[in-house]
């Protein structure tokens, strides 16, 4: 029985291999990958890109660590796909950055079959919302920019969606996959979005327009519910919930996003709701300056994998969610089997689980991530109203400003769940916590570790292990703030004075 699962996503002449980190592997561990029995490469990360492969060919990959095979997989490269060039007949899209190409691009997408790929050559293609379908590929060549407008009308109609844990009608996203239905399985599957280009939307300008428009639309409601508004993070929270995402996936399965820059959604950049087997790798997420501008958000979704990505975001790089009280408890679809590795933050809040976690979050594994340049680092959070659970979390070989497991007071509006959340069964191994968070371009001292459960009996934070954790601060001494904890194990906790 192999120790690690090995997976492959392939194109016609290349494939990306990725695998679980073996339990004995530490930071910088070396792996040797064999292809059809011959050594292909040695690497110090749990993924490898293979090139110059034959199309429609079968391969076997074996991954060796410490002299033994820890996992293997077989994969087949795809046929060479027929290009549907959007700039050619009968579509005639113009990459001049001025012409609105929504209709032309949608026609190309609608014409794309399983053996085709919608192809965008270099250029800037201005567009409104687009709707993808099953069994298709969208490819952006180097220099290609799919640029969403900053005009509200281009993101009509509103569609069933979910935002901050509550189902509602939101503006269409730039790329829309699937139709939301929490009672059903996938209705959009086998989609590839890849290349070397950029997918960007209207960012802060579009967000501000939508918030202002929605605030006017809701002015009587907001005035009548001043207490509800006061419970929110700020006055933009309620009118901002209808903003589009950059890429929205509802009830999707088997989607691969690879190699792109994903930039300036009006809210979150990649949002997966009630979806399964979503793979995102070798992408850059950019949304600095966009309020609430998360990067990659699996929401009541399973088997989602993120690796080799860089984040410069206006909020969380990653936010794992599963609904908000009480609706999230009733729908009861957890986020589970989420794997995040070899990712780096240059700005933003870091990797977060919650706070919308009423449907549950479990089996989250994070390794080999550098979140030094973030504000929150690694954060697991909920509010007392949420209900639900977070359990089965493992974080290994990461650097971050801090580690927080705690309750938060914001985004706490709405009817409470019948009981408080339960946070349990977590392991944090070989972490470096710098005690310095990046905010607004500068570093500030922060508490490196915060551990707190909830005050109701049976809802304490429990069964948590800290092992080989190094903490840096000004003094070289550490007082751990612990509250409502049970079964906390600490091994090899070191505190050093910052030089």
Predicted regions and their residues:
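Extracellular/periplasmic carbohydrate-active domains that bind, remodel
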Residues: 1-499
């Amino acid at each position: 029985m192999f120790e690690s699962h090995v997976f492959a996503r392939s194109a016609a002449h290349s494939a990306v291999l990725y695998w679980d980190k073996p339990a004995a592997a530490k930071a910088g561990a070396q792996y040797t990958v064999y292809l059809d029995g011959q050594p292909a490469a040695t690497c110090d990360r749990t993924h490898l890109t293979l090139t110059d492969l034959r199309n429609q060919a079968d391969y076997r990959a074996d991954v060796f660590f410490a002299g033994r095979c820890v996992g293997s997989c077989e994969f087949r490269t795809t046929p060479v796909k027929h290009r549907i060039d959007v700039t050619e007949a009968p579509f005639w899209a113009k990459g001049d950055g001025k012409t609105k190409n929504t209709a032309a691009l949608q026609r190309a997408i609608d014409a794309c079959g399983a053996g085709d790929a919608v192809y965008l050559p270099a250029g800037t293609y201005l567009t409104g919302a687009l709707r993808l379908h099953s069994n298709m590929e969208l490819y952006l060549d180097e220099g290609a920019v799919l640029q969403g407008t900053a005009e509200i009308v281009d993101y009509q109609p509103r569609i069933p969606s979910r935002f901050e844990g509550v189902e509602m009608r939101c503006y269409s996203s730039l790329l829309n996959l699937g139709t939301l239905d929490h009672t059903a399985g996938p209705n959009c599957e086998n989609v590839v979005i890849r290349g070397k280009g950029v997918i960007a939307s209207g960012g802060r300008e579009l967000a501000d327009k939508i918030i202002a428009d929605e605030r006017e639309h809701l002015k009587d409601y907001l005035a009548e519910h001043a207490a509800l508004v006061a419970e929110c993070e700020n006055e933009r929270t309620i009118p901002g919930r209808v903003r589009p995402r950059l890429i929205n996936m509802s009830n999707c399965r088997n989607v691969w996003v690879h190699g792109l820059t994903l930039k300036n959604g009006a809210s979150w950049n990649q949002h997966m709701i009630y979806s399964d087997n979503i793979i995102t790798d070798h992408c850059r997420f950019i949304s600095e300056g966009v309020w609430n501008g998360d990067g990659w958000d699996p929401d009541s979704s399973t088997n989602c994998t993120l690796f080799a990505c860089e984040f410069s975001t206006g909020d969380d790089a990653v936010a794992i969610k599963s609904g908000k009280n009480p609706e999230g408890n009733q729908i009861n679809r957890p986020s589970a089997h989420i794997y995040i590795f070899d990712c780096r933050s240059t700005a933003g809040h870091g990797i977060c689980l919650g706070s919308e976690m009423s449907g549950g979050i479990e089996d989250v594994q994070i390794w080999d991530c550098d979140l030094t340049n973030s504000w929150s680092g690694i954060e697991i959070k909920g509010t007392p109203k949420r209900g639900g659970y977070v359990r089965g979390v493992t974080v290994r070989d990461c650097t971050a400003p801090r580690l927080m497991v705690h309750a938060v007071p914001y985004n706490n509006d709405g009817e409470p769940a019948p009981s408080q959340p339960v946070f349990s069964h977590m392991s944090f191994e070989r972490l470096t916590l710098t005690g310095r968070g990046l905010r607004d371009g500068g570093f500030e001292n922060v508490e490196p570790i915060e551990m707190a459960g909830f005050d109701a009996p049976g809802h304490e934070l429990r069964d948590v292990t800290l092992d080989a954790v190094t903490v840096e601060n000004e003094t070289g001494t550490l007082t751990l703030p612990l509250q409502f904890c049970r079964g906390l194990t600490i091994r090899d906790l070191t505190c050093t004075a910052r030089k």
